Every structure is written in C-alpha cells, then in structure tokens.
C-alpha cells in the first residue's frame, strides 16, 4: 500500500517528519517497505524561459535558443530540436551534470553541429513523469524563472510504501492509516463527512441481488456527465501510488478506493440493456473484462448481468462491454458489500489481481456502502457535471455491530506490561472503539465497523467427539477469548512491542523436559532408516487436489477447504503418497530416476474422518539397485515390503511378530499388495504396487511400488535394557538359495524358517527374486533367498558352510515343504 505525504494530510493534521512517521508506522504494526521522493530524481531541473529562438545555421530541424534559468544561468545558449520551442515559452531546463531518467543520460556542455549548448530543454517523458512526447513541456506563463521544477510542480512529496497483513483491510486506505497514526501519537485525525446528495429524478436502473455473497448493493444514475481528463491534482495523486490516470469517471473510483478503502464501479448506461442489473450466479460462460482478458466462469462465481449478459465480475473487475469512455454521457455508479471468501476464491481461480479484490477479500467497512456512493457522487458531479438520480438499492445491510470484552488484568498476565485502565480505554477509543460498559476490572467495547478482524465470530470447529452442548459452550468461550486477545493486541501495538520487557520463563523443575516427544523421536529415526535405504526425503503440502484425493478413496466434505491457497490444493490429503507420486512424476520426466530421485519418502500428516494422523510413506519407481555394485532393475513390491519391514523393526517391532494379509486398500494392485499386521487386528502398514489406474492418473508409468507405516498405531517397545551388540571383526558370508514353493506357501514362512535354521550364524534373510513359469510345475514359484551368515570367532570353513546350507534347506523343507531348486 502506497500513499504520499500530501494525501495523508487530507486526513491527518501533523507536523512530524517522514522519518518520525515511518518509525511510528513500524511500531504500530504497519511495516514500512520503502520511502521514495520523486523530487530526488529531479535535482538539477529548473523552470526557465526561452528569451530568443532562431534556426540553427547548419540544421533545419534544430533551433538555437537563449534561455534564462535563474542564478548562474541567466543567459544560456541551448540547441534544441523540439518543434514547439519558441521565444517567450516557459520550459523545464536541465543544467549540466543533471541525470535525465527518461533518457538514462547525464547532461554535459558541448557543441551540437558547431553551436555551443549549455544544457537541455526537456519533455515530461524525459523526466520520467509523463507520456507526452510532442516536444518540450510547456509551462504556464506565470511559472517563475529559476525555481526547482520539483517544487514548482509540487512533486516534492515523499511516497511511503507499507506492507499490509491479511487481517488489516482497514489499512488499505489512507484514512485507515491516518487513524492508526493518530492513535499512535502522530497528529490528529481530521473529521470526514460526506454530503448526502438529494436525487433529482427516480433512477432508471434498479438493483436485484440473487447471490448470497452480495447481501447489500446500492447505486444511482448520473446523467449528462462530461468524461474528460482528470484535473492535475487528481492525476498526481493517482500516479504517486502507481495508478495510471484514465479518465475522470474511472479516476474518481480509483481515488476513493485508495482514499477510503471503498471500491466502486461505473457502468455506461447507454451500453446496458434493460432497466435492471442483477447480482447472480454465473453459468458456465465466458466474460471479457476491462483488461481485455477473456475469463471462463464457474457456477459459484458472482456476476452482475443485464438483459444482454454479463457486465461485471462482481467485486473483481468490470466488463469491457459496459465500460465508460470519452463518449459516456450517462453513468451508473455501483457501491456494494461482497463476501470476502467468495471474492478470494474467484479471484484466485481466475488469477485476477485488482485493487478491488485486494480490499474486498480482506473485508471492507460495511457502514460505508452508502457513504462511499455519496462521496463518488459529489466528486463526479464536481468534476464531470450532470444530474443525480435517487439511490436504488437491493438487499439489506447486515448487522455488523459486535462487542468485545477486555479484563484489564490480562494486560499484565498475558501481555507482560502494566498499563493503567484509563490509558487502556483511551488507546482503544483512539482506534474507534466505543465503551458500552465498564467496571473496575473490565470494559466492554463496541467494535468499529471497519475492523472486520476483531471479534469476527469465526471460530475453528470443535472436536467431532464432543457432545453438541459441550462443543457449543467451548466455541463460545473460544470466541470470547479470541476477542479479548484482539483487544489486547491493539493496546500492545500502540504501547509498542519494543517496550514489552523480556522475561525469562519460570523454571518449574530442575530436570528439563525432553526436547522431543516419543512420536517426534520415532519420526526422526524413520527418516534416518529410509535415507540409509536409499530413499530421498521430501516435504509436501498437507493440501492436494480433490481429484487426486479421490483416487485414494472417499473424499469427505469435512476435508474440503473452503478457502484454499490454490485451486489445485483444495483438499486435506488422505495420504502423503499423493505428494510423493506427483514429485516422482516430475523427477522421472526430467530423467532423475537413477540417482535416488526415483525413490522418495515423507514423514508427514494424513487426514481422515477421525482426525489427523502421522504416517511414513515411500515410493519407488524406475530403476533401482539391490545394493551398490549390483545392476539396477525395475522396482518390485518386495523392495516396498523390505522398506516397510525395516521401518517397523527400527521402531522395535519384532519381525517374527509380523504377518501379511491380502486386504490392502483399493489404490494398490489387488494381487500385488498386502497389509502388515501385528496380531489379527493391529494394522501397522501397507505395501504393494500402485494400481495402474491410480499411477496413470498421477502421471506415472511402469511399475510403481509404495508403502505406508501408520506411526500412530505402532506400539511403543517395552522398556528393556539391552546388552550392547557384539560386533564381529570377520566379514559376513552371503549364500543364495532358490526354493521351489507350492501355491499355498507363504513367503514369510520360508524366510522365517531360514532365519531359525541357525540362530548363532544366520544374521539376516532377504528375498531378492520370485520366478514363475518355465520348467516349474503349474502354480509353483521359485523364491530367491539371500542368507547372510556372520561368523563370530573364526572364519567359516567349506565344511561348516556346507553344513549351514543343509540346515537352512532342511528347516525350510520341514516348515513349508519348499525344496531346493536343482
């Protein structure tokens, strides 16, 4: 938000310097981002007069001028090529050494076609403050000679830019900024009253509102206007805040948008069809805005229509077909109250960024709907003339009045400062709050209409498990507490947060509390485990597209976001696998699937009807290696199962206690997936190939395997003091076996039997291959199993290795009936 010092003086009577104003703005929470004075770029430019002008002897298009430019430049010769240079003309003169911003040059004395030239006569475009280019600028005949041009043109007017937080829609107006400064001790706020203009005739146009996001709208016709350029003062004001002047009618609406924070719109009556304008829902149609862009509207969008069609996208941008121009004679002025959420949703979806949207989506002052129309009427009548109709309206102004209560002791107990009750009340009154009730301990205030962020009544939903009456009382208490905190914040920001003393937290115990919770510690452990297994960690939004969420099951309405940060992030995610799949798709499309980017994991929240849960999720796709130095191959579900098992074992779950059932969720391949359980009821995770339909919808091709660990459901291990592991100095020995197993044999049973063959030597057992077909009997599978043997005191001999191999073979045969493939 930008504003000039002269514009601020329209609302605030002050003597403070720019530096003092900026310091106070920062203290009261309106952070200053920059200060720019246009006069700083115009040092060296003077007002001057051409005393004499004659044609250059060697160039027909040049003139040699004698210029009077004040002290030190009483009689200067300047060679000028402007066609309008003539004797007696008052001009802008650039002295030698002056930087010309519009040309990016510095003026020097020199000769032009043999004639001395001691400066330059300039156009406004060359100064960087205008568009005209038909020669040099022509000043008034009353312009003094030798004065700084910036001072003469009233351009010595610093412009301050501040950052506005989303809750402070009232600070998107110069009056709102002035109000805060006055409350903060800078000057006195001037009263603002607008004239109520009586209508001369009934309005030929009427309003009708059918959209719930427009509770109240007013307007009036002004006929017989003359829409020409705005006066210089108005153009300078708009240019100072970065708004390009267009015409008087448009400039009035832009001026009041910045001055009062009151967006308005004007329609050319001659371009409208019918006698009624209706605020309604859009159909699936297109609309061309004043910016020339074509927008595709949705059924939730709010539009203003006449008999011919859409004339405005309400609260965002007017239509090209009904815009005013230099031929406009009759104009219809609109002032309305629109729902902030609806404006934000449509604006974000259509990527419309206007001053109107910026204010409506933060909430405007509902009490100024009529006053804004009256202010526009007065300005248009003064600048453009015309006759004014009576006001037409539709809907009703909502009851915006609400109260907030502040206990004075809370300034000490919560705010950390000791402020007298009278000073507290006085601070809030300066901000526009009115005391409705006061006792020795507390005061109740009527919240001003322009502060939509205080005691708004919007409270987060309570837990669904609460009794309805309990939830209602809880919400009421939360609302009252938030309103009190709002008032406390207002008092503290005027007091100055820098003045709040720093106080150490009380030490309640000698033994410090753990820095992390057990759940956080387990999440950190899983990150290390997954990284060690070659997966790369990602961090994704907890929001996903609704269509993506639907691929992973039902999409409850309770998980749909009413005000998403982006149109494709409108649903709480049911699983982090969605984010991983999208990231993996982008990585593989860039050829990053061979260096770890084809294997991703995330530890993050997921959401369902019962609430929020913490999950570990991982995906593998593309080529992956079983271990370093081994040829890469396409990811299989066994790697996903191994990842899942490694995570659970790291969390203290005995591998022998795990079992697999073939009832994984529907987003997995129905025949290549499973759930991992501890006992018959406790589901700890899932693994398998993603369903091909789901993978394709998420932009993936080929085999994609995934796994999830439900951290909330993994039991904490029993506290046992374990002996320190004995590390062997000897190399482990790996032996591969191929067992032929029948269709009813569980792979887990084979692995368990191999592991139990020799507890002293068998350190690990892993499945690395499954083969079907060939010479195998129908329905049978060949299971490739790697057994890792770890000797402790001496290296194993061939005889010992052969004995262990026979023990493994015998144990598997006895437990499962699987035989060694010959």
From Swiss-Prot:
Disulfide bonds: none annotated. Coiled coil: none annotated. Keywords: Aminoacyl-tRNA synthetase, ATP-binding, Cytoplasm, Ligase, Magnesium, Metal-binding, Nucleotide-binding, Protein biosynthesis, RNA-binding, tRNA-binding. Its EC number is 6.1.1.20. SMART domains: B3_4, B5, FDX-ACB. Residues 399-502 form the B5 domain. GO terms for biological process: phenylalanyl-tRNA aminoacylation. Binds 2 magnesium ions per tetramer. It catalyses: tRNA(Phe) + L-phenylalanine + ATP = L-phenylalanyl-tRNA(Phe) + AMP + diphosphate + H(+). It is found in: Cytoplasm. Mg(2+) binds at residues 486, 489-490. Residues 728-821 form the FDX-ACB domain. GO terms for molecular function: ATP binding; magnesium ion binding; phenylalanine-tRNA ligase activity; tRNA binding. Tetramer of two alpha and two beta subunits. Belongs to the phenylalanyl-tRNA synthetase beta subunit family. Type 1 subfamily. This is Phenylalanine--tRNA ligase beta subunit. The lineage of its organism: Bacteria, Pseudomonadati, Pseudomonadota, Alphaproteobacteria, Acetobacterales. The gene is pheT.
């Amino acid at each position: 938000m930008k504003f000039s010092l002269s514009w601020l003086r329209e609302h605030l009577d002050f003597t403070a310097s720019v530096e003092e104003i900026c310091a106070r703005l920062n203290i009261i929470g309106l952070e200053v981002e920059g200060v720019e004075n246009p006069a700083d770029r115009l040092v060296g430019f003077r007002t001057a007069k051409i005393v004499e002008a004659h044609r250059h002897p060697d160039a027909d298009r040049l003139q040699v001028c004698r210029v009077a430019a004040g002290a030190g430049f009483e009689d200067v010769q300047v060679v000028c090529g402007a066609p309008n240079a003539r004797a007696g003309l008052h001009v802008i003169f650039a002295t030698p050494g002056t930087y010309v911003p519009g040309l990016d040059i510095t003026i020097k004395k020199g000769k032009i076609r043999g004639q001395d030239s001691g400066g330059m006569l300039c156009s406004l475009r060359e100064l960087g403050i205008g568009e005209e280019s038909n020669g040099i600028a022509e000043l008034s005949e009353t312009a003094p000679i030798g004065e700084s041009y910036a001072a003469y043109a009233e351009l010595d007017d610093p412009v301050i830019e501040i950052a506005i937080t989303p809750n402070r829609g009232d600070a998107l107006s110069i009056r709102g900024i002035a109000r805060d400064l006055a409350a903060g001790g800078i000057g006195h706020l001037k009263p603002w009253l607008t004239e109520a203009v009586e209508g001369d005739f009934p309005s030929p146009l009427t309003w009708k509102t059918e959209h719930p996001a427009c509770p109240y709208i007013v307007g009036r016709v002004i006929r017989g206007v003359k829409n020409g350029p705005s006066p210089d003062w108005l153009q300078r004001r708009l240019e100072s805040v970065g708004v390009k002047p267009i015409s008087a009618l448009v400039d009035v609406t832009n001026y009041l948008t910045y001055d009062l924070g009151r967006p308005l719109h004007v329609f050319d009556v001659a371009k409208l069809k019918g006698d009624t304008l209706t605020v309604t829902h859009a159909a699936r149609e297109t609309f061309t805005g004043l910016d020339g862009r074509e927008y595709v509207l949705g059924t939730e969008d709010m539009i203003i229509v006449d008999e011919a069609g859409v004339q405005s996208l309400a609260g965002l941008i007017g239509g090209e077909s009904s815009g005013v121009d230099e031929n406009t004679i009759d104009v219809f002025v609109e002032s309305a109250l629109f729902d902030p959420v609806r404006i934000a949703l449509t604006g974000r979806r259509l990527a419309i960024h206007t001053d109107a949207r910026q204010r409506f989506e933060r909430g405007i002052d509902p009490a100024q709907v009529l006053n804004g129309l009256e202010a526009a009427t007065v300005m248009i009548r003064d600048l453009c003339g015309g006759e004014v109709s009576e006001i037409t309206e539709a809907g009703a102004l909502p009851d915006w009045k609400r109260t907030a209560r502040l206990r004075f002791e809370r300034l000490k107990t919560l705010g950390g400062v000791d402020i007298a009750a009278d000073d507290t009340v006085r601070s809030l009154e300066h901000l526009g709050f009115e005391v409705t009730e006061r006792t020795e301990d507390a005061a109740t205030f009527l919240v001003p209409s322009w502060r939509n962020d205080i005691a708004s009544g919007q409270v987060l939903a309570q837990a669904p498990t609460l009794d309805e009456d309990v939830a209602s009382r809880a919400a009421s208490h939360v609302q009252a507490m938030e309103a009190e905190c709002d008032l406390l914040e207002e008092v503290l920001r005027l007091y100055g947060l820098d003045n709040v003393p720093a106080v150490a937290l009380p030490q309640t115990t000698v033994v410090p509390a753990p820095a992390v919770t057990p759940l956080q510690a387990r999440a950190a452990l899983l990150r290390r485990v997954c990284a060690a297994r070659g997966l790369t960690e990602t961090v994704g939004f907890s929001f996903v597209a609704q269509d993506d969420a639907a691929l992973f099951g039902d999409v409850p309405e309770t998980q749909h976001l009413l005000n998403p940060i982006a149109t494709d992030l409108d649903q709480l995610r049911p699983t982090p696998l969605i984010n991983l799949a999208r990231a993996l798709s982008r990585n593989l499309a860039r050829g990053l699937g061979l260096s770890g980017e084809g294997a991703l994991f995330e530890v993050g929240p997921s959401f369902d009807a019962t609430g929020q849960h913490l999950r570990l999720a991982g995906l593998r796709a593309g080529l992956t290696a079983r271990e370093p130095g081994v040829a890469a191959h396409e990811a299989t579900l066994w790697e996903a199962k191994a990842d899942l098992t490694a995570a659970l074992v790291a969390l203290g779950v005995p591998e022998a206690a795990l079992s697999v059932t073939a009832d994984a969720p529907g987003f997995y391949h129905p025949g290549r997936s499973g759930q991992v359980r501890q006992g018959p009821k406790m589901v700890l995770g899932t693994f398998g190939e993603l369903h091909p339909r789901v993978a394709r919808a998420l932009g993936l091709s080929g085999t994609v395997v995934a796994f999830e660990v439900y951290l909330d459901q993994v039991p904490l291990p029993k506290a046992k003091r374990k002996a320190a592991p004995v590390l062997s100095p000897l190399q482990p020995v790996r032996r591969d076996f191929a067992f032929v197993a029948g269709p009813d044999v569980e792979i887990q049973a084979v692995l368990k039997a191999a592991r139990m063959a020799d507890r002293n030597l068998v350190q690990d057992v892993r499945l690395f291959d499954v083969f079907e077909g060939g010479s195998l009997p129908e329905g049978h599978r060949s299971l490739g199993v790697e057994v890792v043997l770890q000797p402790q005191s001496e290296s194993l001999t061939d005889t010992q290795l052969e004995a262990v191999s026979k023990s493994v073979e015998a144990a598997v045969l006895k437990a499962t009936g699987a035989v060694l493939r010959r």
